[in-house]
Regions:
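Terminal leader/tail segments of proteins
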Residues: 1-95
Length: 95
């Protein structure tokens, strides 16, 4: 099944190799418009995450959705299959 991530009417990810973990769909990086993702500074809560989470703002021009994407940079066992893959939430629609 092909999944598509859409943000403000723009397709930002598309793949038939997605994985679903804990209700979230994760996309391989090579299927994501990484030019629209801007890494955010790590918060104290981010640093407590056992999976080494990195959040991203989704941004283009003057439009930004803060921390609307993330990846696990050093995942523990359960999240290992989505190591460095991108998950979306907030106002990013997955179909």
């Amino acid at each position: 099944m092909t999944h598509i991530a859409t943000w403000k009417g723009k397709e930002i990810a598309k793949s038939d190799r997605t994985l679903e973990v804990d209700g979230y769909v994760y996309f391989p990086r090579d299927s994501v418009r990484m030019d629209l993702l801007k890494p955010t500074p790590k918060t104290a809560n981010d640093l407590k995450c056992p999976h080494g989470v990195q959040f991203y703002d989704v941004a283009e021009g003057t439009r930004t959705s803060q921390r609307a994407a993330w990846s696990y940079e050093a995942p523990q066992a359960k999240m290992k299959p989505v190591d460095h893959w991108i998950g979306f939430w907030e106002d990013v629609a997955i179909s």
